[in-house]
Amino acid sequence: MDAGKAGQTLKTHCSAQRPDVCRWLSPFILSCCVYFCLWIPEDQLSWFAALVKCLPVLCLAGFLWVMSPSGGYTQLLQGALVCSAVGDACLIWPAAFVPGMAAFATAHLLYVWAFGFSPLQPGLLLLIILAPGPYLSLVLQHLEPDMVLPVAAYGLILMAMLWRGLAQGGSAGWGALLFTLSDGVLAWDTFAQPLPHAHLVIMTTYYAAQLLITLSALRSPVPKTD
């Protein structure tokens, strides 16, 4: 897999010359609108709430199936989106927090695999360790002992995804950055101290991150045909 070519994005995703991109993104946009308009309270635990939360990410997986050239990069992104949807559903129920975190960790590993390791950019890795690393250490201080290891492991995987996304650049880099921001706010709000409007910030940056990473698969503007 050539990660450099795989990560090239269209300069104008929704230009007049590419109306299919906008058309096939409309289910994602509409499902996001439904989510934010319904704004189901977090204490209302139901499969309906899980479906409403998962639907935008599943729409992005469908978008890739229609619009993106077939290949390993696209398939890895689709797998990551499906794992993310599983994580979204699990996080509706507090008791399923660890399985949800495991699902998102799997999604990040698939993103790392998709982004590849060329160019390596070890200096960027050092910067990421020196920047989000202390924040992760601070969050870990607020955890119960049995949560330290899984959260630390997840944080390291997330930083690896950020490293490879930024190394690839383009919309993948911006998506990786927003995903890290979303998870950072979620971690602080969940484990350290409740933040005002945290849920709105978390979900807005999360959906934007998944969209940007998805768009990195558009190496070719031509929809797949049978």
UniProtKB/Swiss-Prot annotation:
One of its GO terms (molecular function) is D-lysine 5,6-aminomutase activity. The chain crosses the membrane at residues 24-40, 47-67, 76-93, 101-117, 124-140, 147-163, 172-188, 200-218. Keywords: Cytoplasm, Endoplasmic reticulum, Hydrolase, Lipid metabolism, Membrane, Transmembrane, Transmembrane helix. It is a multi-pass membrane protein. Residues 1-23, 68-75, 118-123, 164-171, 219-226 are cytoplasmic. Competitively inhibited by lysophosphatidic acid. It comes from the Eukaryota. Residues 41-46, 94-100, 141-146, 189-199 are extracellular. This is Lysoplasmalogenase TMEM86B. It comes from Homo sapiens (Human).
